[in-house]
Curated annotation (Swiss-Prot):
Homohexamer. SUPFAM superfamilies: Phosphoenolpyruvate/pyruvate domain. The lineage of its organism: Bacteria, Pseudomonadati, Pseudomonadota, Gammaproteobacteria, Enterobacterales. This is 2-keto-3-deoxy-L-rhamnonate aldolase. Its cofactor is Mg(2+). It comes from Salmonella paratyphi A (strain AKU_12601). The active site is at H49 (proton acceptor).
Amino acid sequence: MNALLSNPFKEGLRKGDTQIGLWLSSTTSYMAEIAATSGYDWLLIDGEHAPNTVQDLYHQLQAIAPYASQPVIRPIEGSKALIKQVLDIGAQTLLIPMVDTAEQARQVVSATRYPPLGQRGVGASVARAARWGRIDNYMAQANESLCLLVQVESKVALENLDAILEVEGIDGVFIGPADLSASLGYPDNAGHPEVQRIIEACIYRIRAAGKAAGFLAVDPAMAQKCLAWGANFVAVGVDTMLYTEALDNRLVMFKSVQSVSTAKRSY
């Protein structure tokens, strides 16, 4: 099969396009397909905080595949074995959480690339990603089309940000606001002025290094701020949060109850 692998999400990052995404935490292919029909540029399938198995991730990739929205998978960690599984089921873009050092970033790069560029295990003949061995020159194409994003979400990671940005093979850096604010001493308060100052500075440093900058903002005003600061792949909501807010708001229209969604909410 003379198919050529492409990764529109990665191509958009290279061009500097602004790409708007949505976080998927519901773990179901049904919800993933509903989100894919909405027209978001990218959909983050969360395997870190949502109870997704590898098979769950697989089914959601299948559900999204017919649509223009591009899937991004966040595994629970950046282990070589887990990365191998997730890539084999067809993920082309990964977001790796809790990357604190340049050495960690290099290890992740190696885990996502086939030899001689890395240490990804070879098994294309049994992998959905290679159409079960039917894509010619798959290993070279996979190395080229892979998009790797890492999360900076701790005080240690901030101290090592410049070194992380120098690692070849990293396409973008995603700022994790919840963990970052907690690490800085402001738990559940990503809106604190000091945290905001640091986020803005990080986005500037990431873009200045020629990398894409990403963020998750469930508050529309914060999302607009990040876009204005230069972030070019921004998730503007979480499916489970949007669902609970809609349910609560609909209920309060008909019953004298306090809507949960009126309380301050953060990811």
